[in-house]
Amino acid sequence: MESIFGGFGDLVVPRPKEHLGQTDLSFGGKLLPALKICEDGGESGCGGKVWIAGELLCEYILEKSVDHLLSKTVNGTKQFKKVLELGSGTGLVGLCVGLLEKNTFHDGTKVYVTDIDKLIPLLKRNIELDEVQYEVLARELWWGEPLSADFSPQEGAMQANNVDLVLAADCVYLEEAFPLLEKTLLDLTHCINPPVILMAYKKRRKADKHFFNKIKRNFDVLEITDFSKFEHYLKERTHLFQLIRK
């Protein structure tokens, strides 16, 4: 995968140095103690900073977390047990879920924050910073590659161990990676009871629509609008979708 993903850093404009150091995020007091995120100023590429789509997804999760994470809005009454964030970068969204789990004393839910190898040290640093080592685990995951045993869907008695919630924020940014991301989403949902997929995305280029047009062959793409800051994020051209495997 080095040959495919090795150019990620070269293809992305370096991040401004103001995205360096620790940021505390409480999302208007919805998350206390505040989430602590270390940004690396672009040292690890585009993943080493907080992006607006990640903030949107956190806002939605915190607003809709009644009794348990999102259970009242996207999954009936079922408790999510295995959460996977794709392209985690700093780990913002996954760490938000993990800290929410820790603060509300829900037992048994594991959150996996995943990205390419060069971002794993930053993910681990933020996990330690927020003291969610029990709730959140960092794993290397290359889009387009076969899924590891941790994430590959199982059937029968083993399906209870499957990922049941997939989170992705600002993963649609590099056109060369579109087919790889699509393959990973297809692999994760290749089962009788596929996971819920929530994808937040900031519209930047016309090319981005090619990704959504292509995945509509295998997924219904539903825009989520029923949250308090919808209009705010709409002005920022940032959207939230649920992807449902056909």
Curated annotation (Swiss-Prot):
GO terms for molecular function: protein methyltransferase activity; protein-lysine N-methyltransferase activity; S-adenosylmethionine-dependent methyltransferase activity. SUPFAM superfamilies: S-adenosyl-L-methionine-dependent methyltransferases (SSF53335). One of its GO terms (cellular component) is cytoplasm. Disulfide bonds: none annotated. It comes from the Eukaryota. Its EC number is 2.1.1.-. Keywords: Cytoplasm, Methyltransferase, S-adenosyl-L-methionine, Transferase. GO terms for biological process: methylation. InterPro entries: EFM6, Methyltransf_16, SAM-dependent_MTases_sf. Its main location: cytoplasm. S-adenosyl-L-methionine binds at W51, G87, S88, G89, D115, W143, A169. It is found in: Cytoplasm. The keyword Endoplasmic reticulum does not apply. Present with 1760 molecules/cell in log phase SD medium. HAMAP family: Methyltr_EFM6 (MF_03198). Belongs to the class I-like SAM-binding methyltransferase superfamily. METTL21 family. EFM6 subfamily. S-adenosyl-L-methionine-dependent protein-lysine N-methyltransferase that methylates elongation factor 1-alpha (TEF1 and TEF2) at 'Lys-390'. This is Protein-lysine N-methyltransferase EFM6. It comes from Saccharomyces cerevisiae (strain ATCC 204508 / S288c) (Baker's yeast). The lineage of its organism: Eukaryota, Fungi, Dikarya, Ascomycota, Saccharomycotina. The gene is EFM6.
